A protein has these predicted regions:
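Conserved SDR Rossmann-fold cofactor-binding beta-strand/turn motif
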Residues: 109-119, 153, 166-168
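Conserved mid-core segment of classical short-chain dehydrogenase/reductases
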Residues: 1-21, 63-79, 84, 122-128
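A conserved structural motif in NAD(P)-dependent oxidoreductases
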Residues: 134-145, 156
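Conserved internal alpha-helix within the Rossmann fold of NAD(P)-dependent oxidoreductases
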Residues: 30-35, 50, 60, 92, ...
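Short, small/polar-rich loop/turn modules that mediate ligand/substrate recognition or access, typified
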Residues: 104-109, 160-162
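Short C-terminal tail/terminal secondary-structure segment
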Residues: 9, 70-73, 150, 161-174
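Amphipathic alpha-helical dimer-interface segment in Rossmann-like NAD(P)H-dependent oxidoreductases
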Residues: 26-46, 58-62, 100-101, 105, ...
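Catalytic Tyr-X3-Lys loop
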Residues: 6-32, 52, 85-87, 92, ...
Length: 174
C-alpha cells in the first residue's frame, strides 16, 4: 500500500513552480518509485501479489472550491484546494492502470482506492457544506476504509486488477 501527499494551499494564478515540482515529486514520483522497486520485487514472487495505490475522490472529480471559502475574504484571496492535489491523485490512477497491465502476466494486481474525506475536527460550517455534497450526508470515520483496503490486498479480490474504487459515501456518484 502506497500513499504520499503534501498540502500547499495557493491560488492557481500564484501557485509557485517550485511547490508544483515538490508536490509532484512527493505525490507522484514517490509513488512511481515505490511501485517500480516494490512492484518488481512482487513480480519475482511465484504467486505475484497486490499493489494498492491510495488516490482520492478528487482524483476522479474536481474539487468544489466553494467548500474552502470563508466569509469576509475577497474571492481572489480565498484559500483553495491546490491544483497539484487533483493532478497527483489522477496521476496515481493512470499509474495504477499502467501497472495493472504491465505485470499482469506475473500475477501482480494493481488497483487504486479513492477515499473521500475523514471527519477529524473540521469546523462545523465546513462539515455542513461537505455533507450536503455526499449522498450518505457525512464524511467517513477513520476506520471505514480498512475493510475495503484489506479486501483489495487479499486473495478474495484475486480477479480485481486495474480497478479504481471510490469509498466516499457516494460523493462521486453525483
Amino acid at each position: 500500500v502506497e500513499t504520499a501527499s503534501e498540502k500547499n494551499f495557493s491560488r492557481l494564478e500564484n501557485f509557485p513552480l517550485n511547490i508544483w515540482e515538490q508536490d509532484i515529486a512527493v505525490g507522484l514520483t514517490g509513488s512511481y518509485l515505490c511501485t517500480k522497486y516494490f512492484g518488481f520485487q512482487i513480480s519475482q514472487n511465484k504467486d505475484g501479489g497486490s499493489i494498492v495505490n491510495i488516490s482520492s475522490d478528487l482524483g476522479v472529480m474536481a474539487p468544489d472550491q466553494r467548500l474552502y471559502e470563508e466569509e469576509g475574504i475577497p474571492k481572489d484571496q480565498q484559500n483553495v484546494k491546490p491544483v497539484t492535489y487533483s493532478v497527483v491523485k489522477s496521476g496515481l490512477i493512470g499509474l495504477t492502470r499502467y501497472i495493472a497491465t504491465y505485470w499482469s502476466d506475473k500475477n501482480v494486481r494493481c488497483n487504486a482506492m479513492c477515499p473521500g474525506g475523514v471527519e477529524n475536527g473540521q469546523p462545523g460550517d465546513f462539515l455542513d457544506k461537505v455533507h450536503a455534497r455526499i449522498p450518505m450526508n457525512r464524511l467517513a470515520k477513520s476506520d471505514e476504509y480498512q475493510g475495503t483496503l484489506l479486501w483489495m490486498l487479499s486473495d478474495a479480490s484475486s480477479y480485481l486488477n486495474g480497478a479504481i474504487i471510490s469509498v466516499d459515501g457516494g460523493r462521486t456518484a453525483w
